[in-house]
Amino acid sequence: MIIINKANIFNEDMIKDVELVEYFNYKEDLILVERDTFSAFKMLQANLKIKGINIDIESGYRSLEKQESIFLDYYRKDKDYLNKVAMPGFSEHHLGTSIDLAVFDKGKWISSKEELLNLIEPFKIIHKEMINYGFILRYPKGKEEETGYFYMPWHLRYVGIDISLKIRDSILENI
């Protein structure tokens, strides 16, 4: 598993064999996502829909240029930008295996970070179910010191089912 974070920089060789698939989300935006990540997402999405929760991908793969644009936008308007967005070259989104979710709630799609933070009950269910499809919550609540980022309930990382279950079991052992 490739780790990209504030200490581990991305390079193009990391994705030379990655197959990105095209997907049009609820806004008809073109999203690119790594093939296995997308397949797992579609299964998670279908399972959650049965439980009354509708999710979609707000953001997937990001080029260095796209990440730079997002980073500069945060830099201009948020004093805590370094705890909310990765610098270009240090984002898991460069791998295509991380997705940011939008959630349909009370008749509308929610994608703003502030509003998503208030969706406590839907995210409890999403976080419980995602493990079974190979996703982990990369920036959990209470782990800001370790991750270097604020809690981001919408940011999922696909690691495969074996690894997601091992991570879940390891967390449970340490409680």
What spans do the regions from the language model cover?
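Extracytoplasmic cell-surface/polysaccharide-interacting catalytic and binding patches
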Residues: 1-175
